[in-house]
């Protein structure tokens, strides 16, 4: 390669686009990783508080909080307001994430829902059978719903800590299975454990949801209106005797998601430019409206509610419900209690068994038409970590059991959480001991993902660096004036050095509304390409992003010993404009709005653009091709999935 990049440049591991607009799943997982620690700390505090001063603990959560309007009054204790009020927002976040996966993620191809759906059902039926085997014929058999759920937040957090790095497919699979559990649990909570059911109130709630659908179909986008309807639905469901947390899940599932359109982003940029020239309250409102319109309601609501749900609501729920006096009598009773043993074995043994057996049967009976997006070691790991029922299990337990049986169930849930975490650590520890190629296959599998790149790579048309017939292709949509493309360039160079059997493709996406010289720089690259020097010009342009005026471009052409008259003529006639416009159209088809955007074997790469993240994506792609990622040397173990090496810090 020609052209040198400035040395010593520090760069963020994530572009502004990635950190602000896209990759909700990665942001979701990052939040859950941190919130898992807060949740566990809250559980420890609750246990300590209850054992040091049980009376103050119960007294606080037993206080009554009432809402009264005229002759109407809603009165419940604080624990109810946490369990059925604030937890509604937690289930709203879960519903939002499911809907996003349906609209933009793996589940937009509906057949991919089959295996995780059946795996989730298997992970419910086997634990129920184990619990009932311990409690058959006893009054505590009514607590069978306790062992159904997976605590999505804590399970994702534990997987981030205990599982392999850079495996979004693994986390996606866990999220889908866990959400299937949660959906069924919410239905069971509404049907099997209602309190004083009121059909009239349920009909009112159904009418409100129907109104939400009508407004949504008509294109209504007024957020406060949806909020008022959500509150009304919550009150109606609460009066019906059904746990109103179901409202959050339903409202989340009804909130559509879509990728930001480049036209909307350009419109927002135009409005901001007008505001910059003539600041006024009217234009300020216009700018806010434009920015809001560029993002889907799903993205906006996740941004608002997810941190609150993760760092406040779920820990507060644990604080209100985990507190149980652990004394010798309770431990002795729990050691032989059918409730405790049923919960423990259902989660630690039943969950992984149900998920693994169901996945195996679906794959075998469908002749691998329905195959998990991950390998079998990862499926086992998802099964074991799904045994963390914690938050949702406690929620069901408070509805299904009372008195000593409830305390025994809480002990079982706590012990099962520890047991499931330990078995998950063991599974991935054993997987890490496999040889690199087998480890990648065991964790990542060989299932093909959805192709996000709508315009396939054409070696006769595209600008290709590397072997034309390489098994793995990395495509970048870039802008020569975009500073983040310049910051990602060293990682791309290192990637091509580390992996000799990949091809790299550059496609143009000049963001002309914010980068005034991006278009002419792209045309200069095409003019150089007309003389066989596209990549040399590409390297120079990214190395000198602040110097892209026409005179600078002519200087680069002269440095590359190009025919200057031919170069000038190419630029003057704008011969490269059509080619660039075709790349931009392809970007629109693939829902690409920002730069840099990478695709690895047709799948969009989300998140960081440092060498570690890109190498992991390439390694994952090679696992699907059954070929070696490097054809001339042993694999670099630092880059392998499951490596014990620490992550590279952003900016290093």
Curated annotation (Swiss-Prot):
Na(+)/H(+) antiporter NhaA: annotated segments: 1-427
PROSITE patterns the record matches: THIOREDOXIN_2
Compositionally biased intervals (Basic and acidic residues): 628-642
A GO biological-process term: regulation of pH
Enzymatic reactions: Na(+)(in) + 2 H(+)(out) = Na(+)(out) + 2 H(+)(in)
Gene3D superfamilies from the UniProt entry: Glutaredoxin, Na+/H+ antiporter like domain
Membrane-topology descriptor: Multi-pass membrane protein
Listed GO CC annotations: plasma membrane
Keywords carried by this UniProt record: Antiport, Cell membrane, Ion transport, Membrane, Sodium, Sodium transport, Transmembrane, Transmembrane helix, Transport
Membrane-crossing residue ranges in chain numbering: 27-47, 78-98, 114-134, 142-162, 173-193, 200-220, 227-247, 312-332, 343-363, 376-396, 411-431
Compartments (UniProt record): Cell membrane
Sections of the chain in a coiled coil: none
Disordered: region residues: 626-652
Domain of life (superkingdom): Bacteria
Protein family membership: In the N-terminal section; belongs to the NhaA Na(+)/H(+) (TC 2.A.33) antiporter family.
Free-text function comment from the UniProt entry: Na(+)/H(+) antiporter that extrudes sodium in exchange for external protons.
Protein name per Swiss-Prot or TrEMBL: Na(+)/H(+) antiporter NhaA 1
Organism: Salinispora arenicola (strain CNS-205)
Gene: nhaA1
């Amino acid at each position: 390669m020609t052209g040198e990049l400035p040395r010593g440049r520090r760069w963020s591991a994530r572009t502004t686009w990635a950190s602000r607009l896209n990759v909700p799943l990665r942001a979701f997982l990052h939040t859950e990783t941190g919130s898992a620690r807060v949740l566990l700390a809250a559980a420890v505090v609750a246990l300590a508080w209850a054992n040091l001063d049980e009376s103050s603990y119960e007294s606080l959560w037993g206080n009554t909080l009432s809402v009264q309007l005229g002759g109407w009054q809603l009165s419940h204790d604080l624990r109810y307001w946490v369990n059925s009020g604030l937890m509604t927002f937690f289930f709203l976040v879960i519903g939002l994430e499911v809907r996003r996966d349906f609209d933009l993620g793996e589940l937009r191809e509906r057949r991919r829902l089959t295996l995780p759906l059946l795996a989730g059902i298997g992970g419910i039926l086997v634990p129920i059978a184990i619990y009932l085997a311990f409690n058959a014929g006893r009054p505590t058999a009514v607590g069978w719903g306790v062992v159904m759920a997976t605590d999505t937040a804590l399970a994702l957090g534990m997987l981030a800590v205990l599982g392999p790095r850079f495996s979004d497919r693994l986390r996606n699979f866990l999220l889908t299975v866990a959400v299937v559990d949660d959906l069924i649990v919410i239905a069971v909570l509404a049907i099997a454990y209602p309190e004083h059911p009121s059909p009239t109130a349920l009909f009112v709630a159904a009418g409100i949801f129907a109104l939400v659908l009508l407004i949504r179909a008509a294109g209504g986008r007024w957020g406060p209106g949806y909020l008022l309807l959500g509150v009304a639905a919550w009150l109606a469901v609460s009066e019906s005797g059904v746990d109103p947390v179901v409202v959050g899940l339903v409202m989340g599932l009804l909130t559509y998601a879509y990728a930001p359109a480049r036209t909307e982003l350009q419109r927002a940029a135009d409005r901001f430019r007008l505001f910059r020239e003539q600041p006024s309250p009217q234009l300020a409102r216009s700018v806010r409206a434009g920015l809001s319109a560029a993002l889907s309601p799903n993205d906006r609501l996740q941004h608002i509610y997810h941190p609150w749900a993760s760092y406040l609501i779920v820990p507060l729920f644990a604080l209100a419900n985990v507190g149980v006096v652990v004394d010798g009598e309770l431990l002795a009773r729990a050691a032989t209690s059918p409730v405790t043993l049923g919960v423990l074995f259902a989660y630690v043994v039943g969950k992984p068994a149900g998920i693994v057996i169901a996945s195996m049967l679906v794959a075998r009976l469908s002749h691998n038409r329905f195959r998990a997006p991950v390998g079998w070691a990862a499926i086992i790991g998802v099964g074991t970590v799904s045994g963390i029922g914690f938050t949702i299990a406690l929620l069901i337990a408070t509805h299904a059991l009372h008195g000593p049986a409830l305390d025994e169930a809480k002990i079982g849930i706590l012990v099962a959480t520890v047991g499931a975490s330990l078995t998950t650590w063991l599974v991935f520890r054993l997987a890490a001991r496999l040889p690199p190629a087998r480890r990648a296959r065991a964790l990542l599998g060989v299932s093909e993902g959805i192709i996000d790149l709508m315009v396939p790579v054409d070696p006769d048309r595209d600008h290709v660096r590397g072997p034309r017939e390489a098994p793995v292709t990395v495509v970048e949509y870039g802008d020569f004036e975009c500073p983040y493309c310049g910051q990602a360039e060293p990682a791309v160079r290192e990637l091509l050095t580390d992996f000799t059997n990949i091809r790299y493709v550059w496609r143009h996406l000049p963001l002309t509304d914010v980068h005034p010289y991006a278009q002419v720089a792209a045309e200069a690259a095409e003019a150089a390409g007309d003389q066989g020097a596209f990549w040399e010009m590409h390297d120079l342009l990214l190395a000198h992003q602040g110097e892209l005026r026409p005179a600078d471009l002519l200087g680069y052409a002269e440095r590359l010993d190009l025919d200057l008259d031919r170069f000038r003529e190419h630029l003057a006639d704008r011969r490269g404009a059509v080619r660039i416009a075709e790349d931009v159209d392809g970007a629109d088809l693939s829902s690409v709005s920002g730069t840099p955007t990478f695709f690895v074997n047709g799948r969009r790469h989300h998140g960081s653009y440092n060498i570690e993240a890109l190498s992991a994506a390439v390694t994952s792609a090679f696992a699907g091709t059954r070929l070696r990622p490097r054809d001339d040397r042993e694999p670099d173990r630092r880059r392998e999935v499951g490596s014990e090496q620490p992550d590279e810090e952003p900016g290093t």
